[in-house]
């Protein structure tokens, strides 16, 4: 299971989405992972 990730860093956000199998969402410049 992917841990929640809140970041405005582009590189970190991309890794976050990759960790979540591409299901990470961009919300107000942040990547929210683990919530689907």
From Swiss-Prot:
Listed InterPro entries: Scorpion_toxin-like_sf (IPR036574), Scorpion_toxinS_Cl_inh (IPR007958)
Domain of life assignment: Eukaryota
GO molecular function: chloride channel regulator activity; toxin activity
Localization per Swiss-Prot or TrEMBL: Secreted
One Gene Ontology CC term in the entry: extracellular region
Expressed in which tissues: Expressed by the venom gland.
Disulfide bonds: 2-19, 5-27, 16-31, 20-33
Keyword Nuclease on entry: no
Function noted in UniProt: Toxin with unknown function in healthy organisms. On glioma cells, interacts with chloride channels (probably ClC-3/CLCN3) and MMP2 at the surface of glioma cells. This complex is then internalized via caveolae, thus inhibiting the chloride channels necessary for cell shrinkage and tumor propagation.
Domain topic, free-text comment: The presence of a 'disulfide through disulfide knot' structurally defines this protein as a knottin.
Entry protein name: Insectotoxin-I3
Organism: Mesobuthus eupeus (Lesser Asian scorpion)
